[in-house]
Amino acid sequence: MRRIITGHNQEGKSVITIDGPPARSIGEDVGGLFEIWNTNGSPIDTRDSHDRADSEIILSPSPNGTKFRYFQINPTPEGVPWEILQDAAAEAFERIGAAHHRIDTSKHPAMHKTETIDYIILLQGDVSLLLDEEEVRLQPFDTVVQRGTNHAWVCLLYTSDAADE
């Protein structure tokens, strides 16, 4: 994945300040979470070349901040016991400072609730969005505005050529 961040030079001309891979990633063995850009609610300084995504990966943004990230989930292998899935999800959420967001995991081990608005575009694969009372199956290029609800993402089928369809 290539990430291009723009800004301004000392003369006020637009330039590329970062051209390369995401600054940080985590969980690549099960798909991965890749940090693209973060804001913390402070005024924007477009002459600053600091990589705002090069910090510890935490699920939720700081107050008045934002997070722009790419994530991928792989299908859950069949036959994995519920307890193993619960333990793996608990460890994964702990690693990104989000254990406290797992308020009700009775429907799925990855269920979590944040006080954020999340914008999701499914690029490839076959994914279900699980909610407390409903489930919706997503196809490539479906979009979701997730508004602070208890939810989980479940990959039903991953295909590397789904984006080409």
Across the structure, where does each feature detected by a protein language model lie?
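Structural motif
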Residues: K13, D126, N150-A152
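Conserved short histidine dyad/triad with adjacent acidic residue
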Residues: R69-T114, G148
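Conserved small/polar residues in nucleotide/adenosyl-binding loops
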Residues: Y158-E165
